[in-house]
């Protein structure tokens, strides 16, 4: 049996099917050429603090609709989606992530999940207009990159990764 590649994907455009789930599929396609993929989708911008606490305590915690009180219903909620890409199974599964932004605790959580890569999508937001949930996302990206886990930021994800590693990110005039 071949190995399954595990990717944590910070899904910040979930409410836009063409950029959210469609974009996630585009990001995962090259990985799926080589192996089956388990994509663990986290949505810190929509998730409850309680779900984050459960994730910190228990590790891999699936979420239900009750755990995402800020869900944008322009796109329907689902817990899991399976498909085939390049002859390999790809499973997209929504999970909770810690929101606290504490790096030591985030490292423990990342170790318990054991991802092969971490990806942060684009977003309608930017880091120059900071929101509380960005602390948890930034901690995840900072910790994964410092742990030697391949970490990719796309658009906003690039801003968040740079900011979390200490770079100055400014909005262009």
Regions of interest found by a model, annotated:
Residues 1-139, 146:
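N-terminal beta1-alpha1 cap of cysteine-dependent amidohydrolase-like domains
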Residues 150-152, 168:
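Proline-centered loop/turn at the N-terminus of a beta-strand
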Residues 163-173:
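A conserved active-site-flanking secondary-structure segment within enzyme catalytic domains
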Residues 143, 160-161:
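Hydrophobic/aromatic ligand-binding patch that stacks against planar heteroaromatic rings
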Residues 156-158, 165:
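Active-site loop->helix "elbow" adjoining a glycine-rich segment at hydrolase catalytic centers
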């Amino acid at each position: 049996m071949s190995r399954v590649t595990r990717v944590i994907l910070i899904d910040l455009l979930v409410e836009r099917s063409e950029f959210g789930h469609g974009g996630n599929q585009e990001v995962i396609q090259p990985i799926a050429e080589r192996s089956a993929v388990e994509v663990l989708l986290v949505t810190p911008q929509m998730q409850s603090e309680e779900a984050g606490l459960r994730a910190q305590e228990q590790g891999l915690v699936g979420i239900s609709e009750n755990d995402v009180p800020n869900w944008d219903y322009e796109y329907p909620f689902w817990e899991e989606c399976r498909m085939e890409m390049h002859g390999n199974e790809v499973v997209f599964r929504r999970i909770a992530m810690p929101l606290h932004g504490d790096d030591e605790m985030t490292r423990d959580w990342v170790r318990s999940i054991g991802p092969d890569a971490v990806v942060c999508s684009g977003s309608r937001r930017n880091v120059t207009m900071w929101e509380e949930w960005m602390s948890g996302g930034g901690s995840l990206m900072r910790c994964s990159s410092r742990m030697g886990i391949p970490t990719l930021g796309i658009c906003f994800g690039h801003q968040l990764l740079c900011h979390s590693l200490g770079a100055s990110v400014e909005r262009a005039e």
